[in-house]
Amino acid sequence: MSALKIYNTLAREKQPFTPIEPGKVRMYVCGMTVYDYCHIGHARVMVVFDLVQRWLRASGYEVNYVRNITDIDDKIIKRAAENGESISALTQRFIDAMDEDAAALGVQKPDHEPRATNYVPQMLGLIEALERNGLAYKSSDGDVNYSVRDFPGYGKLSGKSLDDLRAGERVDVNTGKRDPLDFVLWKSSKEAEPDEVKWASKWGSGRPGWHIECSAMACELLGQQFDIHGGGADLQFPHHENEIAQSEGASQHTFVNYWMHNGFVRVDNEKMSKSLGNFFTIREVLAKYDSEVVRFFILRAHYRSQLNYSDAHLDDARNALTRMYTALKGVAPDQAALDMTEAHALRFAEAMNDDFNTPLAVAVLFELANEINKTKSPALARQLVGLAGIVGLLQRPAQQFLHAGLANGEDGEMETFVVEQIEARVNAKKAKNFAEADRIRAELLEKGIILEDKPGGLTEWRRA
């Protein structure tokens, strides 16, 4: 079996993975800013890095996985004011919602979920270190900014040179800055802001900037240098670039060894945005599709590729997952342990060790399903369930998935309806009213239900 290789955004190539401490992996992922419900782009970040930590653990590593929560931000302050509620109430409500969404998608809890507001002292210490190193200055408006041009390595992650950069999207233009590209480390308090977003500091009352939050939490929980830092491609610049500048500017050594970024999510080949009316929260998607279908849809694409969300692609994912569960119906896995030396398992591991190549890994799962259809082998069923379980799939009884409603919450009503229709069809056949029996079968098929007549008069059903 080949060793794990990871595409390192910083190096712009796949590299063999060698942790700082043998057998142990320290990993940080940028989490959610909790002022609204999580959308399908957040779902991809959750599922992708859940996959990464699952495979690392399955490979024998001891993993310390940190995914932060941004619970102080301009958007949070604005939303709380609009709602007329406290910031703590707003953020707790959406943290609870985020946890529910993550659990529905089969995302395991990180080892640590630090909230930014609990790490302000560490942020202040980091800013003081930057000031001592000549990289931070207080501007005329009271903010403390980072002097980008005084950090020689700025731009190495994004591949952008300072001369090519301009103050654009997500880069504040502020007349108090020495350079438009400088970014805020500490925001001075505004009179209209609530007291719960004001902290005392040597520079005056204020609150942390977005970028310093992640640097401080990561270094506090994982050390000044750690193995993997992940997040969405949209965070590569400026957020992750600025994290490097802050962390390495303070410590004077490498911050992160491997940078991982998952690709964008598009909707029907367009950028997802509220203005285009194609913005979907996880909850909206789960109202239409089973949560495992959504997870499978995300995992079928390579994490670095663009993911195109559409009903057609979700329908295809549901049908594909149905094929695998159908293969397991009536074939109970044997009780032996998963055999990672078996041929399918070796190919699965090869795929996962090749920068978490889930399209190839999923192809191996389909090969197993096809062989189970032919052989009805309990040993192969065990391999399929075991390998799929590593990536958080196929862990329900087959009949439970095959009977599941299109949307979460519909299962009970749908099952009752189908059972009643099957009984009516049985009675029609007993009365030799075969036209009525055929009509019931056709009506159920229109609703996405397939009936399968078995010996002895038994009828089973599943989703199409």
Curated annotation (Swiss-Prot):
Major site of localization recorded for this protein: cytoplasm
Positions bound to Zn(2+): C30, C214, H239, E243
EC number annotated for this UniProt entry: 6.1.1.16
Enzyme class: ligase
Cofactor names: Zn(2+)
Motif ('HIGH' region): 32-42
Cofactor note: Binds 1 zinc ion per subunit.
InterPro entries attached to this UniProt entry: Cys-tRNA-ligase, Cys-tRNA-synt_Ia_DALR, Cys-tRNA/MSH_ligase, Rossmann-like_a/b/a_fold, tRNA-synt_1_cat_dom, tRNAsynth_Ia_anticodon-bd
Record-stated family: Belongs to the class-I aminoacyl-tRNA synthetase family.
Protein name stated in the entry: Cysteine--tRNA ligase
Gene: cysS
